[in-house]
């Protein structure tokens, strides 16, 4: 029977519940347990797919095509289990499900209420999500509850967790509460009162935490931990100090050294083998002892909020670990490039344009791509970054001066990028797609396996095929591919059924390393293995750096 660990947060948001949950899961997995993780989001949106990155940060796409919270990206990077749609759900999904049941008459005319109907539905979603992993045989499911204790939005989730612990009985549920211990500079001391109040608030709901993870900018002294223990009525050994670290991959060892996994295993009556964190220690050592150093320019419109590119940043770090390279990222606002200022690109060892939506800042990205192509700077374009590379090439190499995407200009003379319902096929007919087409209507989501053209950079990187995740509405227009290929572009991967361009590159006679991909490779990169595309990209930047030295 699967046992549950609920991870809650108090005082303020953004303390790192996702990292804490993923780190604990990584330790438990190293002890031989089968683990999975779930994220419960208290907002009313059905999913984060239509939310602004400024509001929510990155949207992480699972293998089965779910648009989910960015914490699921942390989960996949820390444990071996692959997340699914059932690993993340929101208040919106819960209410939607309950209302559908009410309309179908499943509640037999009863008054539908938060308790028991909403809380029962939350419990059903949690147990269903846990059962979807490891063929229903997960030993432990860690359940992160979004928001902070005291928020009205989180109350039904906390109540559902309390009811689950009562229903399943002792030793089947544990609670880990993450809280803030701020340092007040004017007083020169850490303050424990917010933590005391947060635990008190949790107890009012009926939940007594098994362990407290106390976040601070420095290690918390034993006397302060003893004070928290006394007022929170928790053993001192269960008051865990979690201070700011320069790498999230140090957190598993930090928690393990203070015995968090032992406390949880004792609470759940589990007796697994000792933890083996040697892999994490090797990764941290590689990160702290690089032999090389490069600077990559990330050109985007969300650069003021790096949470929007969380998986991409981590993928570059993973590549650095596996190539003994410190990867510095220079964030460049694409709108600033529209009025010039290309001199900011000169010191860079490589340029990257990530995914995105909307017209704002696109011309600045195109200028950066043109600079990379003309100055032989290694370039990687992801999703929109590939589409803009095609537009730039069409304009400046294939003599289509007005080339654009119909996302930005519906009246463009050369729509080299368009919605899948807008394509013109080779016979001049309008290509039609519907919701029954592979991966849905106008939004392609989830993983798709694609063969790769032999003799290309793509084949050197991936081999015979690639299986990556998608999240986009627009595609390179097949009608223009022959002209683009005639001008020198190489389409190195296409979908097997619709023949959609998945990867493009320039031959070495035109550029040493210029690659665009329609998918999102950052979603499958892990610190354990890195990712072949990002490793090749970092190696290309190193080669360019050596050549220019």
UniProtKB/Swiss-Prot annotation:
Binding site for CTP: 13, 151-153, 191-196, 227
Record: residues binding Mg(2+): 71, 144
Enzyme Commission designation: 6.3.4.2
Record-listed ATP binding positions: 14-19, 71
Pathway given in the UniProt record: Pyrimidine metabolism; CTP biosynthesis via de novo pathway; CTP from UDP: step 2/2
Gene Ontology terms, MF aspect: ATP binding; CTP synthase activity; glutaminase activity; identical protein binding; metal ion binding
Keywords: ATP-binding, Glutamine amidotransferase, Ligase, Magnesium, Metal-binding, Nucleotide-binding, Pyrimidine biosynthesis
Record's keyword annotation contains Magnesium: yes
Residues engaged in binding L-glutamine: 356, 384-387, 407, 473
Listed GO biological process terms: 'de novo' CTP biosynthetic process; pyrimidine nucleobase biosynthetic process
Reactions catalysed according to its record: UTP + L-glutamine + ATP + H2O = CTP + L-glutamate + ADP + phosphate + 2 H(+); L-glutamine + H2O = L-glutamate + NH4(+); UTP + NH4(+) + ATP = CTP + ADP + phosphate + 2 H(+)
InterPro entries: Class_I_gatase-like, CTP_synthase, CTP_synthase_N, GATASE, GATase1_CTP_Synthase, P-loop_NTPase
Annotated function: Catalyzes the ATP-dependent amination of UTP to CTP with either L-glutamine or ammonia as the source of nitrogen. Regulates intracellular CTP levels through interactions with the four ribonucleotide triphosphates.
NCBIfam families xref list: PRK05380.1, PyrG
Further remark: CTPSs have evolved a hybrid strategy for distinguishing between UTP and CTP. The overlapping regions of the product feedback inhibitory and substrate sites recognize a common feature in both compounds, the triphosphate moiety. To differentiate isosteric substrate and product pyrimidine rings, an additional pocket far from the expected kinase/ligase catalytic site, specifically recognizes the cytosine and ribose portions of the product inhibitor.
Protein name: CTP synthase
